[in-house]
Amino acid sequence: MLSEFKAFIMRGNVLDLAVGVIIGGAFTGLVKSLTTNLIGPIIAFATGGTTDLDQLQLVITKTLTFKYGAFLNDVINFLITAFVVFLIVKFINRLFKANKQEEAKANPELEILTEIRDLLDAEKKAQ
């Protein structure tokens, strides 16, 4: 049972997931710091309000308060995170696309086989 667990843990996708979770947690802290320490003060300067977005609220009654600042803070965090993930995925896709193009160019046999296939298709259509 211990050897099965070791084999499971050492599989590539489990390790990749663990690394992703750890980096994701660190990245979340970084984005929260960016929002709190840089974007929040810029918004506060522009609006003349508080530097902590979480403090922004609309008091309807003593018991009913809409904390729109906390929501705004979460929206900014989400947008920053989503944009960075988009950029990372776009970069990785570009790398994979470049590698596939290099592989296709590096294989002259594939090019010859493609030409033969096209000639055979043309011959079948002519008959």
From Swiss-Prot:
PROSITE patterns: MSCL (PS01327). Keywords: Cell membrane, Ion channel, Ion transport, Membrane, Transmembrane, Transmembrane helix, Transport. It holds the Pfam family MscL. The keyword Thylakoid does not apply. It is found in: Cell membrane. The keyword Nucleotide-binding does not apply. GO terms for cellular component: plasma membrane. InterPro entries: Mechanosensitive_channel_CS, MS_channel, MSC/AndL, MscL_channel. The chain crosses the membrane at residues 14-34, 69-89. Homopentamer. Belongs to the MscL family. This is Large-conductance mechanosensitive channel.
